[in-house]
């Protein structure tokens, strides 16, 4: 069952760049909630809440219970626009969720057991092909993350979709059967010891 994260927001009446700038001058982040065949809802957020979610990670697959003037809407945070210089959030897009309507969402992958992997202990290199996977999911069962155990991987072993934990309620959108998530590659040639140099030849006798 999806865990909802509560977010308090305030309504704002006007759309447009000028209204958004005014919201920022008031110390808030302008945002919009769209989808579920309803009119978009214009809201403003405390920037500290947005930064908190960014720092937590996994916000793209987290379901939020956005409360505006006492009414709440389940929604996904689809995009956070950042200022090009300060990297502060300047706008947020939410997608309102409708019960029973599946959505596409990026779910992050958490890697564990790297320090116990026989292949990595022998000098192998972990190559992560995908840090996230896009899946189709019911809003009531969106996983916040998938987990994969690397502790048994040797050199040339790999991790695939079927090896991930927590995928039972979702379907990957990538149309490749059991695609690769990560591999343990052999050490590169640059890391192998160089052969000892041959001794210099003795000078010829005159």
Curated annotation (Swiss-Prot):
Molecular-function GO terms, alphabetical: 5S rRNA binding; structural constituent of ribosome
GO (cellular component) term, any one: cytosolic large ribosomal subunit
Key words, A-Z: Ribonucleoprotein, Ribosomal protein, RNA-binding, rRNA-binding
Pfam family, one: Ribosomal_L25p
Superkingdom of origin: Bacteria
Residues covered by region (Disordered): 1-23
GO biological process, one term: translation
InterPro entries in alphabetical order: Rbsml_bL25/Gln-tRNA_synth_N, Ribosomal_bL25/Gln-tRNA_synth, Ribosomal_bL25_b-dom, Ribosomal_bL25_C, Ribosomal_bL25_long, Ribosomal_L25_dom, Ribosomal_uL5_bac-type
Biased composition range(s): Low complexity: 10-21
Subunit structure and binding partners: Part of the 50S ribosomal subunit; part of the 5S rRNA/L5/L18/L25 subcomplex. Contacts the 5S rRNA. Binds to the 5S rRNA independently of L5 and L18.
NCBIfam families associated with the record: bL25_bact_ctc (TIGR00731), PRK05618.1-2 (NF004128)
PANTHER family (UniProt xref): RIBOSOMAL PROTEIN L25/GLN-TRNA SYNTHETASE, ANTI-CODON-BINDING DOMAIN-CONTAINING PROTEIN (PTHR33284), RIBOSOMAL PROTEIN L25_GLN-TRNA SYNTHETASE, ANTI-CODON-BINDING DOMAIN-CONTAINING PROTEIN (PTHR33284:SF1)
Biological role stated in the UniProt entry: This is one of the proteins that binds to the 5S RNA in the ribosome where it forms part of the central protuberance.
Entry's family note: Belongs to the bacterial ribosomal protein bL25 family. CTC subfamily.
Name by which UniProt lists this protein: Large ribosomal subunit protein bL25
Record organism: Gluconacetobacter diazotrophicus (strain ATCC 49037 / DSM 5601 / CCUG 37298 / CIP 103539 / LMG 7603 / PAl5)
Originating gene: rplY
């Amino acid at each position: 069952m999806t865990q909802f994260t509560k977010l308090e927001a305030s309504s704002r009446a006007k759309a447009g760049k000028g209204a958004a700038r005014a919201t920022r001058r008031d110390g808030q982040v302008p945002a919009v909630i769209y989808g579920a065949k309803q009119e978009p809802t214009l809201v403003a957020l405390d920037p500290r809440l947005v930064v908190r979610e960014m720092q937590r990670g996994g916000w793209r697959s987290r379901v939020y219970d956005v409360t505006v003037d006492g009414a709440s809407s389940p929604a996904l945070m689809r995009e956070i626009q950042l200022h090009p210089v300060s990297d502060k959030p300047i706008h947020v897009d939410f997608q309102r969720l409708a019960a029973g309507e599946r959505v596409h969402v990026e779910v992050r992958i958490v890697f564990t057991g790297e320090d116990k992997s026989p292949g990595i202990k022998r000098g192998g290199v972990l190559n992560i092909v995908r840090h996230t996977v896009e899946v189709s999911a019911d809003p009531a069962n969106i996983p916040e993350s998938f987990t994969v155990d690397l502790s048994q991987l040797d050199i040339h072993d790999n991790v695939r979709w079927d090896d991930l934990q927590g995928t039972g309620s979702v379907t990957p959108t990538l149309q490749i059967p059991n695609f690769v998530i990560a591999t343990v590659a052999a050490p590169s040639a640059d890391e192998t010891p160089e052969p000892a140099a041959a001794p210099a030849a003795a000078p010829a006798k005159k």
